[in-house]
Each structure stands twice: as C-alpha cells, then as structure tokens.
C-alpha cells in the first residue's frame, strides 16, 4: 500500500499548491492523507478548503489544535460522507466528529488517527493512553497516526511508545520538515514533523514582517499569510502487512 501524507496546508498559497500539484502525483499512490489544520487563513479549515482538497485527490483530511476555528465544518465532521478526522483525545463525549476513521484501500484496511500533544499546548486527554485504548481493537488494519504536537520530545516518545504497534507516526504542527525519517523497530515509520504546505518565503507561513517586528520590538504585531510561491511537504510511505517497509520525505516547490 503506497500512502502519501501531506503536512499542514497553510492559507490560500497552500491550498493552491495542493490543488495544482496533487492531481499530477496522485496516480503514484493508493491513498493520500492531508493535514488541513491551517488551510483557512492560517487557522483551521473551512468548508471550501475541505472540498478543494478532496477534489484534488485527498482521501482523508486531518486537523489539529485549530479544528474548531470555523463552525461551518462542524456538520461535516459528523457526516460519514466527508472523510475528516479531528483530534481523538478530546474529553467531551459530545465533541463533533471522530478521531479516527478506517478506509478500504484496494481491499486492505487503513485506519487514520489524529492526536493532539499536550506539551506547550492546550490541555486535552493523555494522547498516549488514548491511543492505547484505541489499539485494544482488532479491526483497525494498518494504522497511521498524525500526531499534532509542539515538542520534539513528546513526538519521539509517541513514536517509541507505538513502535511495532502502528504502521506510522508522523508529526505535524511546527511546519518545518525534520530530517529524521526512519523505520522504528517493529516496522513503524517515524518523522518528527512532516513540514507544511504553504508560502515558501515566509516565517512558518506568515508574512515575514509581522513575526520579525514582534522579535525586534518585543510587542505584538499583526500576522498575515505570506504571498508568492509555495512549497508542499510530506512523507511518502509504503506499507505491507500493517508495517512500514519504506518512508521518504516528499518536497515540491513552485517555480
């Protein structure tokens, strides 16, 4: 099973490069997962962004800590017709949507899970224990985990915690692709962060002036989505029998 995971789509430039580039490479993969956490102006995902990604060839959309920023997607989260997965480890049983979904990929089961980290982020249920509970099921097939977290240590800990128990643990949220792509013991693909899909000449997606002035003046400044050419980052994976046999960073930059 060949799976492409694409990191956090950021704003209109991220949506543009996704919708232009993904259709050209989609035939190379059996399934595509896209994190859409920042696709609507840098914060969350709205209905049009979701539809655009699905039309481009995405088979599943994941989210993160900005999942609730746009209320127009709340009904979509709870409809099986929309393959969207929000973070699993929210305590409230009335939280819209689901934290995992299982897909049929050419006759094989692929389960996509979305988790939130807790270090330097808002309080949510323990992602390690939440994942342990899910893995008590025996009907998940090949399991892919999008771990949306800030701290490298927490992401690495999750990778080792799930080594040999899932097919992949790929981090999102920090927007910079890391060079630690590998296969952990037991056949679990791991990368601390897939990187983002958005403006290339930016500060993790934002127009340079706002963040730069904040550092220079130590005062708040307005942030906006940067313009210009965009990049697309992700991880290309190969799974066999519920295990990863290959993992490679994927990167494309517009001319």
UniProtKB/Swiss-Prot annotation:
<keyword id="KW-0464">Manganese</keyword>
<dbReference type="InterPro" id="IPR005235">
    <property type="entry name" value="YmdB-like"/>
</dbReference>
<keyword id="KW-0170">Cobalt</keyword>
<feature type="binding site">
    <location>
        <position position="37"/>
    </location>
    <ligand>
        <name>a divalent metal cation 1</name>
    </ligand>
</feature>
<dbReference type="GO" id="GO:0050189">
    <property type="term" value="F:phosphoenolpyruvate phosphatase activity"/>
</dbReference>
<feature type="binding site">
    <location>
        <position position="148"/>
    </location>
    <ligand>
        <name>a divalent metal cation 2</name>
    </ligand>
</feature>
<keyword id="KW-0408">Iron</keyword>
<feature type="binding site">
    <location>
        <position position="175"/>
    </location>
    <ligand>
        <name>a divalent metal cation 1</name>
    </ligand>
</feature>
<comment type="similarity">
    <text>Belongs to the YmdB-like family.</text>
</comment>
<dbReference type="GO" id="GO:0004113">
    <property type="term" value="F:2',3'-cyclic-nucleotide 3'-phosphodiesterase activity"/>
</dbReference>
<keyword id="KW-0378">Hydrolase</keyword>
<feature type="binding site">
    <location>
        <position position="173"/>
    </location>
    <ligand>
        <name>a divalent metal cation 2</name>
    </ligand>
</feature>
<dbReference type="GO" id="GO:0008663">
    <property type="term" value="F:2',3'-cyclic-nucleotide 2'-phosphodiesterase activity"/>
</dbReference>
<dbReference type="InterPro" id="IPR029052">
    <property type="entry name" value="Metallo-depent_PP-like"/>
</dbReference>
<dbReference type="GO" id="GO:0046872">
    <property type="term" value="F:metal ion binding"/>
</dbReference>
<feature type="binding site">
    <location>
        <position position="38"/>
    </location>
    <ligand>
        <name>a divalent metal cation 1</name>
    </ligand>
</feature>
<protein>
    <recommendedName>
        <fullName>Phosphatase/phosphodiesterase DR_1281</fullName>
        <ecNumber>3.1.4.16</ecNumber>
        <ecNumber>3.1.3.60</ecNumber>
    </recommendedName>
</protein>
<feature type="active site" description="Proton donor">
    <location>
        <position position="66"/>
    </location>
</feature>
<feature type="binding site">
    <location>
        <position position="37"/>
    </location>
    <ligand>
        <name>a divalent metal cation 2</name>
    </ligand>
</feature>
<feature type="binding site">
    <location>
        <position position="65"/>
    </location>
    <ligand>
        <name>a divalent metal cation 2</name>
    </ligand>
</feature>
<feature type="binding site">
    <location>
        <position position="8"/>
    </location>
    <ligand>
        <name>a divalent metal cation 1</name>
    </ligand>
</feature>
<comment type="function">
    <text>Has a dual activity phosphatase/phosphodiesterase in vitro, with a preference to phosphoenolpyruvate (PEP) and 2',3'-cAMP, respectively. Can also use 2',3'-cGMP, 2',3'-cCMP and various model substrates such as p-nitrophenyl phosphate (pNPP), bis-p-nitrophenyl phosphate (bis-pNPP) and p-nitrophenyl thymidine monophosphate (pNP-TMP).</text>
</comment>
<dbReference type="Pfam" id="PF13277">
    <property type="entry name" value="YmdB"/>
</dbReference>
<keyword id="KW-0479">Metal-binding</keyword>
């Amino acid at each position: 099973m060949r799976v492409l995971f694409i990191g956090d789509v950021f704003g209109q430039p991220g949506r543009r490069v996704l919708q232009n580039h993904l259709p050209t490479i989609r035939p190379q993969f059996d399934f595509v997962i896209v994190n859409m956490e920042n696709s609507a102006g840098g914060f969350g995902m709205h209905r049009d962004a979701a539809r655009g990604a699905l039309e481009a060839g995405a088979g599943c959309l994941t989210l993160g800590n900005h999942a609730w920023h746009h209320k127009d997607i709340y009904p979509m989260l709870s409809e099986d017709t929309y393959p969207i997965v929000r973070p699993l480890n929210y305590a409230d049983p009335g939280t819209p949507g689901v934290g995992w979904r299982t897909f049929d990929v050419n006759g094989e089961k692929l389960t996509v899970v979305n988790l939130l980290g807790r270090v330097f982020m808002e309080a949510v249920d323990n992602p390690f224990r939440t994942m342990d509970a899910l893995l008590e099921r025996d009907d998940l097939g090949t399991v892919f985990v999008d771990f949306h977290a800030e701290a490298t240590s927490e992401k690495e800990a999750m990778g080792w915690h799930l080594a040999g128990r899932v097919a992949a643990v790929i981090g999102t949220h920090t927007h910079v692709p890391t060079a630690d792509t590998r296969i952990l013991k037991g056949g679990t693909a791991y990368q601390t962060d897939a990187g983002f899909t958005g403006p290339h000449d930016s500060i993790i997606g934002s127009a340079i002036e706002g963040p730069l002035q904040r550092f220079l003046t130590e005062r708040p400044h307005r942030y906006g989505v940067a313009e210009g050419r965009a990049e697309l980052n992700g991880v290309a994976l190969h799974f066999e029998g519920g295990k990863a046999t290959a993992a490679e960073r994927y990167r494309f930059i517009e001319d």
